[in-house]
Amino acid sequence: HMGVPFNTVQEWLKGYDASSITIGVVASHSSLQILHGARQEGFRTLGIAVGENRRRFYKAFPGADPDEWLMLEDYREMLDYAEWFREKNVIIVPHGSLVEYLGASNFRNLEVPTFGNRNILHWESSRALQRQWLEDGGCTMPKVVEDPHNIDGPVIVKYAGAKGGRGYFVARDYRDFRRNVDIEEAVSYTHLTLPTNGCV
């Protein structure tokens, strides 16, 4: 699905007050630098979050604490707030956590101006596509171990998606893998093989 047509985004932007742009971002580890940079450039900032814990966390980072918060029950509610975002001259700056929480398809259909190419986030949401892109570009890539039973030397194991910012560990064999991985957490994800994205 192609998402929002470019000429539609252009029409929305014609209605924006260029002197009063607000940079909106889903609050996660990925957004601290975005919020800090937006503030340094003189933009108002909007943090979008589910749960009060996020809000409290940002108070510890004065340069990255948003000017305003939009608190939601579920990130998919962003789709319902599109007109509200546009009325506030919001430009959404996407990042990996937004794709993880909202979904690439929902993001492509979000009726709000965004920074960058919406379709590139389809690649952001897929490790396999990222790998293909790098291999097609001639990059040498580490071997992927699909099945943890096949670990026969040191591998780096990484959780996929938003959990990927934490949860790295090294395993030497299957037993080591089992000792380190939180199986209960792994099973709660849609990809049962997510902790096997290891590299030699």
Predicted regions and their residues:
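Positively charged, low-complexity intrinsically disordered leader regions
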Residues: 2-10
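Glycine-rich phosphate-binding loop of ATP-grasp-fold ATP-dependent ligases
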Residues: 154-182, 192
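Short beta-strand "acidic-cap" motif of Rossmann-like dinucleotide-binding folds
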Residues: 47
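N-terminal phosphate-binding or glycine-rich loops at protein starts, especially the Walker A/P-loop
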Residues: 9-39
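Conserved small/polar residues in nucleotide/adenosyl-binding loops
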Residues: 190-196
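Catalytic core of tubulin tyrosine ligase-like
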Residues: 184-186
